[in-house]
């Protein structure tokens, strides 16, 4: 369907350095819809693996290193990504994130700073870098990854909840500025998702209790994010901006 066709579009995706992760599934969705995709950031070991998995530039993927929390590394990585895409970026998907669990009274200052740096500050700076290009183009799509903890406080995840709440407000603030310029800024809030990192929790007693509360009666899978990702990256969402879309199996409706 032409409305969802991304042929010729140029995309940068952060947080997709793991083959089994959510953001790689989203990067795949963009690629399958026709976009040329840069995977930006992550450890060099993971990125080298992703180069092998994706097949490299010949197959429409580029893999670029860069520490998103370091200004010079982030800017150099973005510049390389932009060069790979011929100087244009139509889609930015901000998926890089981290988590740290600790009671608030004992939360280490350096861990608080680290979580906020990756989940919120780096996201803003990536939006800023891509936004400058998109403003010159007069068009663009930015997709930020929020969380259930954008709406729910969670338990012993103060920094994560604060950062993901910030993602929602950042998305709205940028939408207010940039929608009049032809740039749509939206967010996806994944629910409880089945990944390599969450598997042990999913099969625990707590995980079973969570499953019982999800109307879909299962945890989400990375591929459950593919459809909404293509929608938000395509012309189908041209009149949608500042929105936060939960993909949670109905969890928030309970």
Predicted segments with their positions:
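Residue(s) in the substrate-gating loop at a strand-loop-helix junction
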Residues: 147
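Alpha-helical segment proximal to the catalytic Tyr-Lys
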Residues: 132, 176-180, 238
């Amino acid at each position: 369907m032409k409305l969802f066709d991304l042929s010729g579009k140029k995309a940068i995706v952060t947080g997709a350095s793991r083959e089994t992760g959510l953001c790689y599934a989203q990067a795949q969705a963009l690629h399958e819809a026709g976009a040329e995709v840069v995977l930006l950031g992550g450890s060099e070991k993971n990125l080298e693996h992703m180069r092998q998995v994706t097949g490299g530039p010949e197959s429409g993927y580029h893999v670029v290193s860069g520490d998103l929390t370091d200004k010079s590394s982030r800017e150099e990585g973005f510049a390389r990504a932009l060069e790979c895409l011929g100087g244009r970026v139509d889609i930015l998907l901000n998926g890089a994130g981290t988590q740290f669990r600790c009671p608030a009274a004992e939360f280490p200052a350096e861990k608080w700073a680290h979580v906020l740096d990756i989940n919120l500050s780096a996201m803003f700076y990536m939006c800023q870098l891509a936004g400058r290009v998109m403003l010159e183009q007069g068009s663009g799509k930015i997709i930020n990854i929020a969380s259930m903890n954008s709406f729910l406080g969670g338990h012993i995840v103060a920094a994560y909840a604060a950062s993901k709440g910030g993602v929602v407000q950042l998305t709205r603030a940028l939408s207010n500025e940039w929608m009049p310029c032809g740039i749509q800024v939206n967010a996806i809030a994944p629910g409880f998702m089945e990944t390599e990192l969450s598997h042990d929790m999913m099969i625990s007693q707590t995980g079973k209790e969570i499953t019982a509360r999800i109307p879909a009666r299962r945890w989400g899978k990375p591929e459950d994010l593919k459809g909404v990702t293509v929608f938000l990256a395509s012309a189908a969402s041209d009149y949608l901006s500042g929105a936060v879309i939960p993909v949670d199996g109905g969890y928030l409706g309970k």
